[in-house]
UniProtKB/Swiss-Prot annotation:
One Pfam entry name: Ribosom_S12_S23
Alphabetized PANTHER family for the sequence: 30S RIBOSOMAL PROTEIN S12 FAMILY MEMBER
Species for this entry: Acidobacterium capsulatum (strain ATCC 51196 / DSM 11244 / BCRC 80197 / JCM 7670 / NBRC 15755 / NCIMB 13165 / 161)
3-methylthioaspartic acid PTM positions: D89
One GO molecular-function entry: rRNA binding
Xref: NCBIfam families: rpsL_bact
Record text on subunit structure and interactions: Part of the 30S ribosomal subunit. Contacts proteins S8 and S17. May interact with IF1 in the 30S initiation complex.
GO cellular component, one term: small ribosomal subunit
Keywords: Methylation, Ribonucleoprotein, Ribosomal protein, RNA-binding, rRNA-binding, tRNA-binding
InterPro entries to which the protein is assigned, alphabetical: NA-bd_OB-fold, Ribosomal_uS12, Ribosomal_uS12_bac
Gene name of this polypeptide: rpsL
CDD domains linked to this entry: Ribosomal_S12 (cd03368)
Known role: With S4 and S5 plays an important role in translational accuracy. Interacts with and stabilizes bases of the 16S rRNA that are involved in tRNA selection in the A site and with the mRNA backbone. Located at the interface of the 30S and 50S subunits, it traverses the body of the 30S subunit contacting proteins on the other side and probably holding the rRNA structure together. The combined cluster of proteins S8, S12 and S17 appears to hold together the shoulder and platform of the 30S subunit.
Protein name (database record): Small ribosomal subunit protein uS12
Length: 131
C-alpha cells in the first residue's frame, strides 16, 4: 500500500482498457479487400459451415471476418466494410462484414431485422404495411 506522499508524487494509475477489436484502431468501421472467402466449422457443441472471409484492411492489418445472413456474393478481391463484433463459436473471428455496403449485397427475401442485413423493404401490397 503506498504512503500518502507517494500518492501525491505519482498518483494512482487507472487500469488500461483493452479493446475487443484492435484492428479497427478506434474507428467504428473500416474498409478492406477480401483475400480469401471460405467456410469454417464452429466450436464443440455446435455444428455448421460458417461463412468467413480473410480481409486486408486499409491500415494493412489482415483479419478474419464473419459474413452474416443466408447467402452472399463475396469472392476474392471484393471490397467490404467491416465492423467489430465477435462470433462466439468461431475462435479468432472478431469482426463482421457490413451487408448492403460496397461490394456486399444485402440478404435476399429478408422481412424482419432488415437493417442488420442490408435488406431493402419489400414492395408488397396491403400486407407489407400492416402487421
Amino acid at each position: 500500500m503506498p504512503t500518502f506522499s507517494q500518492l501525491v508524487r505519482k498518483g494512482r494509475t487507472a487500469p488500461r482498457y483493452k479493446t475487443a477489436s484492435p484492428a479497427l484502431q478506434g474507428s467504428p468501421q473500416r474498409r478492406g479487400v477480401c483475400t480469401r472467402v471460405y467456410t469454417q466449422t464452429p466450436k464443440k457443441p455446435n455444428s455448421a459451415l460458417r461463412k468467413v472471409a480473410r480481409v486486408r484492411l486499409t491500415n494493412g492489418i489482415e483479419v478474419t471476418t464473419y459474413i452474416p445472413g443466408i447467402g452472399h456474393n463475396l469472392q476474392e478481391h471484393s471490397i467490404v466494410l467491416i465492423r467489430g463484433g465477435r462470433v462466439k463459436d468461431l475462435p479468432g473471428v472478431r469482426y463482421h462484414v457490413v451487408r448492403g455496403t460496397l461490394d456486399s449485397v444485402g440478404v435476399a427475401n429478408r422481412k424482419q431485422g432488415r437493417s442488420k442485413y442490408g435488406a431493402k423493404r419489400a414492395k408488397g401490397g396491403a400486407a407489407a404495411g400492416k402487421k
